[in-house]
Amino acid sequence: MCFCVIKVPSCIIYFTNLKVLQLCGIIFNIDASPRIHLPVLKKFDTKNCSWLNAHDDVTIDAPLLESVLIEQDRNSVFRKPRSCQIKFSASCIKEFTYRSLGGISQPIVLSNSSAARNASVNIILNKDGCESYVQETESCAFILLKQFREVKCIKFDASEVLTQPNVAILPKFAMLSHLELGCVSDVVLLRLLQKSSVLNTVLFKVPRLSKFNQELLNSAVVPDCLTSTLQVVKFENVRGSKHELFLAKYFMENGMVLERMSFSCVSWCNKDLIEEFKEKLYSFKNGVSFAILEFRF
């Protein structure tokens, strides 16, 4: 269903045989808090949809739900009144993706964090030329991320929206083994590592720090994952910058069980700069790390 306005009745709604729900460009006008029962739904997929109500929320009751994909463009993110909270009541989510241009203006909650225990989580936020994200992004991103404390894989390409106070009160990610990050500050990176004690793989899609304090990272207590579980560190879109060099050096010096570190360089990067970058890395590696260094151009 695409591009229309639907008035949602204030009652319990049943779709007893629906297994796949795909909606595009729908504006739902809501008078009260509807509860939508979808007993056999497996896939919930919406693009540029808005659930307009200033006070109430929408509950999606789908016990068999496996896949959630929510995509928003700038118009749907900045639309007023803001979209109300969506609550998923499910028990076996395997894949959750939220992708938007402009941030998050819509709180998304799970009735039970264990519902996503086996999920792969992908959260991607882009500014799309905007000077800043929509105002609610910081709080909504925090609410969304903290609910996935039991998952094994998180891809979070929106790390710059997290603040130090928010990261400090995030729960521990006791099962997290794979973490992918976009641009991130030194403090946020350190806190995420400290809260992920069994982390096996870290991938930096944009390997630079939005805030750079070498003394802070060097003086902080080394996260447990670096001394016991972290085996693979990957850097994508490498340009040979000092931030990338420092991050690599930090992991080589502190990664006691590190086995492999890979670098995927941008195609247009100066070859001489990359060769200099490689030489410095190998000089750090000598006597410090037994990890294999890999380069792709």
Regions found by a protein language model. Give the residues of each.
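Hydrophobic, well-ordered secondary-structure elements that form the walls
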Residues: 192, 233, 251
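Leucine-rich repeat
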Residues: 1-172, 177-192, 200, 204-220, ...
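Basic, glycine-rich polyanion-binding accessory segments appended to enzymes
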Residues: 226
